[in-house]
Amino acid sequence: MENLIEKLKKAKVSSYTLALLNTNEKNEALRAIANNIEKNIDKIIKENEKDLKRGEEKGLSKAVLDRILLNEKRLRDIIKSIDDVIKLPDPVGEIVSMQKRPNGILVGQMRVPIGVIAIIYEARPNVTVDATILALKSGNAIVLRGSSDALNSNIIITEIMKEALSNTKVPPDTVQIIESPEHSVVEELLQMVDYIDVAIPRGSAKFIKHVMNISKVPVIETGAGNNHIYVEEDADFEMARKIIINAKVQRPSVCNAIEKLLIHKNIAEEFLPIIAKDLREYNVEIRGCKRTLKILTDAIPATEEDWYTEYLDYIIAIKIVESIDEAIEHINKYNTKHSEAIITKDYYKALKFLRMVDAAAVYVNASTRFTDGGEFGLGAEIGISTQKLHARGPMGLKELTTTKYVILGEGQIRE
């Protein structure tokens, strides 16, 4: 417990120094991190292999092992994402608005760092870098608590980043890692309102709900992705096939992959066998509603639990719907408010879907796989918020700041 508090104290104190640094000083620190990661790619891969071996011994699924995996390509993608963040404008110090009052004072809002951010995440060691670079560029200290399944990877990456910071203006203590695998440490961390300004959980819906239930620290809810694609009766079949396959099988273990497919009843008999054949070429297990089972007789019956489930695997549940209204109603009942898509040629139906579906990202004729900080031009993201207050959708630099009022006067007093 003392060790935890000591780490949090260091992060808090360092956050004040970081908040004073200019953009060039912060960018130099990010560049140093990128260079040091590149120098140590082999070392990171070696530690990552330990996590993968341990995961295989534990019987982790292929989807989870894929989330843990760091190969040279993924590490070079991480390095590129750091370069992308360096190029982004720094929101800190930006005056959001300024107005002159009748008495002559100027009243405005300035963007400032949140302070100390704790991120609690499951088996994704790339988050260790993404969270750190975004936090540092936006002037925040970061406390990292990753999954024990990627512990070796997270530790070596953090050591490499802190080593890089030791030769920059950014204090290495602005980056802290909680190495203990004990769940009780997470509960302790989430009570530390004197040191942590906000907590961001990333993981399954069950995990995120648990964090929100036990935390005294303010929490930004991030997204599990029980995502849907709805195929309207006027949809272009070739477009629909391409989008569905990309959204389901390109990388099924990530939160912007789809888990459910809704199909208008008027095209179900023609389209279902086509898309089922496509999905089965990738060994996707198909579950379906009663109407789906009449067309795909070898599909597995979908249960009520299926409609709520984020599989993160080669599994999809299919439902035939009467109309766009039923599709929207179904999505809003079962989704996790992450990413939803419609495939249609009808402008008005597309507009209705955009307006009525409750999600952080809503698509027309495109794959949900684009819900990502890099794809949205944010460089990277610390998480994808599925709540409606403070931030919604991929959280980049601006979302890791808050505002304070700044008032400029020339001796005015209130009469």
UniProtKB/Swiss-Prot annotation:
Provide the reaction this enzyme catalyses. L-glutamate 5-semialdehyde + phosphate + NADP(+) = L-glutamyl 5-phosphate + NADPH + H(+)
Stored SUPFAM superfamilies: ALDH-like
Gene Ontology BP terms: L-proline biosynthetic process
UniProt family annotation: Belongs to the gamma-glutamyl phosphate reductase family.
Q: Which organism is it from?
A: Dictyoglomus turgidum (strain DSM 6724 / Z-1310)
Q: Which cysteines are joined by disulfide bonds?
A: none
- CC terms in the record's Gene Ontology section: cytoplasm
Instruction: Give the pathway listed in the UniProt entry for this protein.
Output: Amino-acid biosynthesis; L-proline biosynthesis; L-glutamate 5-semialdehyde from L-glutamate: step 2/2
Which EC class heads this enzyme's classification?
Answer: oxidoreductase
Q: Source organism's superkingdom?
A: Bacteria
Keyword Amino-acid biosynthesis, does the record have it? yes
What is this enzyme's EC? 1.2.1.41
- InterPro entries recorded: Ald_DH/histidinol_DH, Ald_DH_C, Ald_DH_N, Aldehyde_DH_dom, G-glutamylP_reductase_CS, Glu-5-SA_DH, GPR_dom
Q: Which HAMAP family match?
A: ProA
Location in or out of the cell: Cytoplasm
Q: Does the keyword Transferase apply?
A: no
Q: Give the matching NCBIfam families.
A: PRK00197.1, proA
Protein name from the UniProt record: Gamma-glutamyl phosphate reductase
- What does UniProt list as this organism's lineage? Bacteria, Pseudomonadati, Dictyoglomota, Dictyoglomia, Dictyoglomales
